[in-house]
Regions:
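Conserved S-adenosyl-L-methionine
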Residues: 122-132
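Short alpha-helix
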Residues: 106-120
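Conserved SAM-binding loop of SAM-dependent methyltransferases across substrates and taxa
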Residues: 1-6
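S-adenosyl-L-methionine
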Residues: 8-64
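Short, glycine-/aromatic-enriched active-site segment of Class I SAM-dependent methyltransferases
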Residues: 83-102
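Flexible, glycine-/basic-rich loop-and-beta segments that form/coincide
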Residues: 139, 143-176
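A short glycine-rich, Lys/Arg-flanked "PGG" loop and its adjoining helix->strand segment in the class I
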Residues: 63-80
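Residue-level signal for inorganic ion chemistry
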Residues: 20, 84, 137
Length: 176
């Protein structure tokens, strides 16, 4: 999608190997960093800070990778991160089939990432529910972060989660 929308270069980072779609692997605008742990990523590894970071991570909390993600983002850059509650709330709070059904836990997951970003000087400009549920049926959320104070608070996160209580239900964006 980034390339279709005009990105001149995309840096793809994956701890695995060969996970990227074949057509993207063949695209000269895509710089692939397979077998790279995101926690060890530096701006030097990818040619300097970037203007936009898009994160869709699994099996790890975004709170654990915020520092390296922010370190590769330019001061006036943007982050669009997918918050997956099942990886944020802790294994003991995940329900049957790996799905987080409790609305308060979903909101807690988003707020925990929002709070971790705020502690580092980055604020949420918007939060919205993904129109597609995760493979197991989890409702997932996108956070848009920028350096400086955010315009999305805990109440807005709570409202967004409540508005989209049904799995896979699409919502309107919260924020500017």
């Amino acid at each position: 999608m980034l390339l279709r929308r005009g990105a001149t270069e995309v840096v793809a980072v994956d701890v695995g190997h060969g996970q990227l779609a074949w057509s993207l692997q063949q695209d000269e605008r895509v710089k692939i960093h397979d077998r790279t742990n995101i926690r060890e990523l530096t701006a030097e590894m990818i040619g300097g800070p970037v203007d936009v970071v898009v994160g869709d991570l699994s099996f790890i909390s975004l709170r654990l990778v915020l520092d390296p993600l922010l370190a590769v983002t330019s001061e006036d850059g943007d982050l669009a991160l997918m918050v997956k509650p099942q990886f944020e709330v802790g294994k003991d709070k995940v329900g049957k089939g790996g799905v987080v059904r409790d609305l308060d836990l979903r909101a807690e997951a988003v707020r925990s990432v929002l709070d971790a970003a705020a502690e580092r000087g980055w604020g949420a400009r918007a939060v919205t529910t993904s129109p597609l549920p995760g493979p197991s049926g989890n409702v997932e959320y996108f956070l848009w972060l920028r350096h400086g104070p955010g315009s999305v608070d805990a109440a807005a996160v709570h409202d967004e989660v409540r508005r989209t209580a049904s799995l896979g239900e699409r919502s309107d964006k919260v924020g500017p």
